[in-house]
């Protein structure tokens, strides 16, 4: 194998195995920043040895063994340094008592081969609430997504130094706060899991409907969020909201190819060619939703949103959509996760089920809500309802206001076209 081919093989293996390697190192050293350094050192070792010695029969095992050794060496060094600082005034038996437990714990951690638990710990640590939302997203994509700083920066249209600083600060914050590398206890788990799901869905949403830039969608972000969601569902198969989120993302991703035309312009849901929807993703989404439902209990916001997406997925054409059922699901969603955005979406469903006049009354009641003051979908929805009611001049004004508020160029073009056509 040529050196170039070997490097390509290393890159491919690394992209798949990096999260597991970082997770295993973090299990031993209890610091995700140090763990990533050790993982990078292991990658450098592979780049040095494999072109000379050949690619191992089991590349992933080679990397895992190498990072374990480096992690244990780091723990030994730190334990010895700590012992030397404390040895003044102590006998050697006291010194040994100080050193041995740390090494024993590290050896026990390194010998535990349950990589699934390690990944789950890394997910919870990367999404810890002590971090800002932006920091959680960046750190998760770096450690668990295997994305480079440059790739994250390009995905979110953010300068690379800004992303790099976010990641560095996130690692420092986790270390300073002494955040344990562990799966949270039962009483803390719901809130911590909600933080994880929020991060994954934020990544997906930015791919599904980009908030800024020249592209309407960024499929690579959707793919990454889906991958993380599927990994999490495999590690936590009895969590209905995890399954609900996976179902929601699968169903929404199934429409990705139909959401833009050949020129990359947005195509709204009711105008989409449903033959372009991905049937495999629809089946996967419906199956995940069924598993979430079978777990019982009160349906959470992600499971309810997945049920909403399923209503669209089951409709062979737009006119087959059960809008009354969608209104009922939004009623349920408003109970468990009340927000003005949910109310706005419910108003859209009411308009489809019962007519634009009923919906406009609901939308007008939201116009003074400060949470929606800069939300471009409010004037967009209002413009659509006014157009259906024949109030063209008012509709044009609303679409123009929505165009002023959006930061996505493709969406702005769509809204201005709607203003012209109203």
What would you call each of these model-derived segments?
Residues 13-32, 45-49, 124-128, 209-212, ...:
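Amphipathic, Lys/Arg- and hydrophobic-enriched alpha-helical face
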Residues 1-23, 33-36, 190-198:
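A short, charge-rich alpha-helical start-of-domain segment used by transcription regulators
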Residues 78, 86-134, 142-151, 158-331:
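Amphipathic helix-loop-helix modules that constitute alpha-helical solenoid scaffolds
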Residues 245, 249-252, 305, 309, ...:
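"A position-specific structural signal for the A-helix of alpha-solenoid helical repeats
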Residues 229, 236, 296, 330, ...:
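Alpha-helical junction/boundary sensor with strong preference for TPR arrays
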Residues 43-47, 57-86, 171:
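Σ70-family region 2.3-2.4 aromatic/basic alpha-helix that recognizes the −10 promoter
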């Amino acid at each position: 194998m040529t050196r170039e081919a070997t490097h390509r093989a290393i890159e491919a293996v690394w992209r798949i195995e990096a999260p597991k390697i970082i997770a295993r190192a973090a299990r031993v050293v209890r610091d995700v920043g140090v763990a990533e350094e050790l993982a990078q050192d292991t990658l450098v070792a592979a780049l040095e040895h494999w072109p000379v010695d050949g690619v191992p029969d089991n590349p992933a095992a080679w990397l895992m063994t190498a990072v374990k050794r480096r992690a244990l060496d780091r723990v030994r060094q730190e334990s010895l340094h700590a012992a030397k600082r404390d040895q003044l005034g102590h006998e050697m038996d006291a010194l040994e008592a100080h050193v041995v437990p740390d090494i024993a714990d590290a050896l026990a951690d390194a010998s535990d081969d349950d990589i699934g638990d390690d990944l789950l710990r890394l997910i919870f640590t990367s999404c810890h609430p002590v971090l800002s939302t932006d920091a959680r997203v960046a750190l998760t994509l770096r450690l668990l997504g295997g994305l480079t700083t440059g790739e994250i920066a390009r995905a979110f249209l953010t300068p690379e130094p800004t992303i790099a600083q976010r990641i560095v600060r996130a690692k420092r914050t986790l270390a300073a706060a002494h955040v344990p590398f562990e799966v949270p206890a039962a009483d803390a788990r719901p809130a911590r899991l909600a933080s994880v799901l929020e991060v994954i869905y934020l990544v997906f949403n930015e791919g599904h409907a980009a908030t800024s830039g020249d592209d309407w969608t960024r499929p690579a972000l959707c793919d990454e969020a889906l991958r993380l969601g599927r990994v999490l569902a495999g590690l936590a198969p009895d969590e209905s909201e995890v399954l609900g989120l996976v179902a929601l993302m699968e169903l929404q991703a199934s429409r990705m190819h139909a959401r833009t035309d050949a020129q990359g312009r947005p195509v709204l849901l009711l105008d989409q060619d449903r033959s372009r929807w991905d049937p495999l993703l629809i089946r996967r989404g419906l199956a995940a939703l069924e598993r979430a439902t079978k777990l019982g209990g009160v349906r959470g916001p992600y499971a309810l949103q997945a049920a909403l997406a399923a209503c669209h997925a089951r409709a062979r054409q737009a006119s087959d959509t059960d809008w009354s059922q969608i209104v009922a699901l939004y009623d349920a969603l408003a109970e468990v996760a009340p927000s003005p955005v949910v109310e706005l979406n419910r108003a859209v469903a009411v308009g489809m089920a019962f007519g634009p006049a009923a919906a406009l009354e609901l939308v007008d009641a939201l116009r003074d809500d400060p949470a929606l003051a800069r939300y471009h979908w409010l004037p967009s929805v209002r413009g659509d309802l006014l157009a259906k009611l024949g109030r063209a001049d008012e509709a044009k004004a609303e679409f123009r206001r929505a165009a002023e508020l959006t930061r996505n160029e493709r969406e702005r073009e769509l809204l201005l076209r709607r203003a012209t056509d109203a």
